Amino acid sequence: VHFVASANTTEGTDFPLRDVNEQADSWLDATVDNSQHFSYLAQQFAMQLRAAHPNVPVGIIQTAWGGTPIRNHVKGGSIYANHIAPLEGFHVAGVLWYQGCNDSANEATALTYESQMTSLINQYRAVFDQNDLPFLYVQLARWPGYQYTQNVRFAQLSTLSNVGLHNASNVAMTVSLDTDKGTSTLIHPLGKDILGARMAAQYLAMSEGKAVPNGPLIAYAKHASDGTIILSFQKGTATGLQAEKPNYSKTASTTVPNYTANSDATPLDGIANVATPTSASLQGFEIADDSGKWA
């Protein structure tokens, strides 16, 4: 696994390298020493791909810039201008996207997030000249610090079916609601290993022409006579749905399975027991109406 990471600057028109890449004048190996400069989510994603295809090298071009609104990442935005536009003509295998917290801070940006996200997917695919380029993104974690987080989360879900997408194939959202291992009060919760595994499973399914894994998707809801709401899910998206009890004592893995040496290792080794089965029945779901207001 190798990576190139961009510097957080909008000066100039050339792709701005971080000092570690600038000094090396090359791709950097994803070693322990270099990992501090490299997205942990991307590391976990790459690890899963290596597990599935140990003889295929993985290269990550990292353009992440924390605390920035999505408008800076689309055409006309300051980050797009020297982080994305210079990559036009490159061949890439896909895009990983985890952003939206900044846009959750005020109502105006939250309410325009879906249209911005839809444009971003179309534009990035155009840059790399592939209208079905795999685009994988994470739905925001449930951090309660910003008032409009739920609106952005709903916008991210709605993007999947937005009619403005030039091509809806190979677009997948990874749910993070159940992955934080009890750290939902942190703006950067645990669980990137789980997210990386889920995104890799989606990408591998896309590349192999198989059904892409996703979370349950509601088709419709109706009121029952007893005052409850009955939810119906889209066919095939809620098979085997069951209640589980979160393991709040589970911490991030300190070791990584050696997939090359151990053929029995699986991509989910090291992140098992995040939740355990329970005899409890499902009690309810968090739902929102078309305006993004949550019930």
Q: What residue spans do the PLM features occupy?
A:
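Cell-envelope and extracellular/periplasmic
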Residues: V1-A295
